[in-house]
């Protein structure tokens, strides 16, 4: 049995999802201020670096449960219709997260190339948690 590597899984996801640059994120947030920016990093990462101002923290392990209306963990305040933009530290986990919710049926989803630091380098503010 040949197992797929994490790198292969990420590449498969990248081939099926939309990736935007931090500059495109800036334009998207201007054109669509209701778009939800979602940080899927571990809470320890957020405590160390903070998060992008205005982003929602949604731990990767809870993603599918928080977005599933039939789950006891469903978060009603995260509208299924709103555009969702995921980021992590680099862009591997966010690629997998984007593919997962796309597989759930969500349509307006993407992730940010380069992750947290690339977004910060584009001029986005950080807020401590």
Language model feature labels by segment:
Residues 1-35, 43-84, 92-129:
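Rhodanese-like catalytic fold shared by cysteine-dependent sulfurtransferases
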Residues 38:
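Active-site flanking residues adjacent to catalytic metal/cofactor-binding acidic residues
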Residues 87:
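Short, surface-exposed ligand- or partner-binding patches at beta-edge/loop junctions that are enriched
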